[in-house]
From Swiss-Prot:
Entries under InterPro entries matching the protein: Conotoxin, Conotoxin_d-typ_CS, Conotoxin_omega-typ_CS
Alphabetical list of Pfam families matching this protein: Conotoxin
GO molecular function, a single term: sodium channel inhibitor activity
UniProt protein name: Delta-conotoxin-like MVIA
Tissue/organ expression: Expressed by the venom duct.
Naturally occurring in which organism (per UniProt): Conus magus (Magical cone)
Tree of life domain: Eukaryota
Homology family: Belongs to the conotoxin O1 superfamily.
Localisation per UniProt entry: Secreted
Modified residues (Serine amide): S83
Length: 84
């Protein structure tokens, strides 16, 4: 019985925490879909296609592949060249 009460309180706490820490829980989906539709009509408008601030091949990146323009990082940004 005690375990059940603890589980119920934990679930309620986590659910409340999720809504409290959300950026915009009221109009989040309402504003999300028009933006997505706009990006489908105009792929150039997508922020995912922009790689501002990425590092070129040969630049030190540590172990974070998101820093490289080519998305391949093994201490330095790597670009694979197709020979065929």
């Amino acid at each position: 019985m005690k375990l059940t009460c603890v589980m119920i309180v934990a679930v309620l706490f986590l659910t409340t925490w999720t809504f409290v820490t959300a950026d915009d829980s009221r109009y989040g989906l309402k504003n999300l879909f028009p933006k997505a539709r706009h990006e489908m009509k105009n792929p150039e408008a997508s922020k995912l296609n922009k790689r501002d601030g990425c590092y070129n091949a040969g630049t030190f990146c540590g172990i974070r592949p998101g820093l490289c323009c080519s998305e391949f990082c093994f201490l330095w940004c790597i670009t694979f060249v197709d020979s065929g």
